C-alpha cells in the first residue's frame, strides 16, 4: 500500500501544477511541501504509516510536515488549517471523523490544494482529489471466512451443533468500519439465521456493535458486560473483533472472567497485525 500511496501523492502533485514524473526525485531547489495528518500516535499502525510515508516522500525529494492529532478532531482541524496557511502543495489526511472536516477541506479546495484521503474516505465533500485505501469489505470477508473455517461451521450445522459469538465492530464515524462489517456478515449471517452461530446478547447490527473511535477500553467494557450478563452458565466461543485493540480488550475481559488458554479460550479475531497481537497469537490467545 505504501507504494500506492506515494504514487497517488505524485499524481496529486501533478494536479496541483507540479511537474513530477513518478520515480524521479524532485530537484533540491524545487522542493514541494506535503502536509500529512494522522489520527493518533497511540496505535502502532498509524505510527508506521506516518513514518513510512514521510520516509518515502523525502526519498523522492519532497519536504513533509507530519503531524498526529491524538484522536482529537479539533486538533486535526487546526493542524490542517496551519498546513494550508504554511503553503503546503498537497494534503494527505487520515481522518479521525470522516464527516467532521468539511469546512477545512473547503478551505484547501479554495486554495487549490489537492487532498488525498488516506485509508478513511472523507465524507460529505467534493474537495477530495484521491482516495488511497484497501479492500475493507474484503478484510471483513476474510475475518468471516477464518471464523467459518476455524470452527468448521458447515460441519457444526450438519451435526446440529452451535457456537456462541459476540461482535466488536469499528467506529461509526469511520466509513471503513461499515464496509468491514458488511463483508463479515456476508459470510456469517447465514449461520446466525440457522442457529449455528448464537449471539446471546442479541447485538448483531452494525449500530449495536460499533465502537466509537475504535476504543480498546470500550471493547473491554462491552465484553465484560456480555460475559456477566449472558455467559454466567455458558462459555463464549468466538469474539468477532474488527481490530487488534478490540482483541486486547476482549483478552483482558476474558482473563478477568477466568478463561484460560488451552482450556476454554475462545477464538478472537483482529486486524492490523500489531506486534503485540502477533505475540498473542503465538502464545495461543
What are these regions (language model features)?
Residues 2-5, 26-285:
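A residue-level marker of the well-folded mature domains of exported/periplasmic proteins
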Residues 15, 25-26:
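Cleavable N-terminal signal peptides
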Amino acid at each position: 500500500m505504501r507504494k500506492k500511496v506515494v504514487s497517488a501523492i505524485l499524481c496529486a502533485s501533478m494536479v496541483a501544477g507540479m511537474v513530477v514524473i513518478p520515480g524521479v526525485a524532485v530537484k533540491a531547489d524545487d522542493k514541494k511541501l506535503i502536509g500529512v495528518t494522522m489520527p493518533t500516535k497511540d496505535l502502532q499502525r498509524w505510527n508506521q504509516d506516518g513514518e513510512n510515508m514521510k520516509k518515502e516522500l523525502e526519498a523522492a525529494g519532497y519536504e513533509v510536515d507530519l503531524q498526529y492529532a491524538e484522536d482529537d478532531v479539533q486538533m486535526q482541524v487546526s493542524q490542517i488549517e496551519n498546513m494550508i496557511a504554511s503553503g503546503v502543495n498537497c494534503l494527505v489526511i487520515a481522518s479521525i471523523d470522516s464527516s467532521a472536516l468539511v469546512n477545512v477541506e473547503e478551505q484547501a479546495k479554495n486554495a487549490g490544494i489537492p487532498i488525498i484521503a488516506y485509508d478513511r474516505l472523507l465524507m460529505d465533500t467534493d474537495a477530495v482529489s484521491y482516495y488511497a485505501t484497501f479492500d475493507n469489505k474484503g478484510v471483513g470477508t476474510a475475518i468471516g471466512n477464518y471464523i467459518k473455517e476455524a470452527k468448521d461451521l458447515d460441519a457444526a450445522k450438519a451435526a446440529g451443533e452451535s457456537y456462541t459469538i459476540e461482535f466488536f465492530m469499528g467506529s461509526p464515524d469511520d466509513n471503513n468500519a461499515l464496509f468491514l462489517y458488511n463483508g463479515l456478515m456476508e459470510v456469517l449471517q447465514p449461520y446466525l439465521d440457522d442457529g449455528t452461530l448464537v449471539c446471546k446478547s442479541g447485538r448483531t447490527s452494525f449500530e449495536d456493535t460499533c465502537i466509537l473511535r475504535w476504543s480498546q477500553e470500550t471493547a473491554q467494557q462491552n465484553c465484560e458486560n456480555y460475559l456477566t450478563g449472558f455467559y454466567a452458565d455458558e462459555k463464549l466461543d468466538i469474539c468477532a473483533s474488527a481490530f487488534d485493540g478490540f482483541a486486547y480488550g476482549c483478552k483482558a475481559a476474558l482473563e478477568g472472567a477466568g478463561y484460560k488458554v488451552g482450556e476454554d479460550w475462545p477464538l478472537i479475531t483482529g486486524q492490523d497485525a500489531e506486534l503485540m497481537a502477533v505475540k498473542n497469537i503465538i502464545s495461543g490467545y
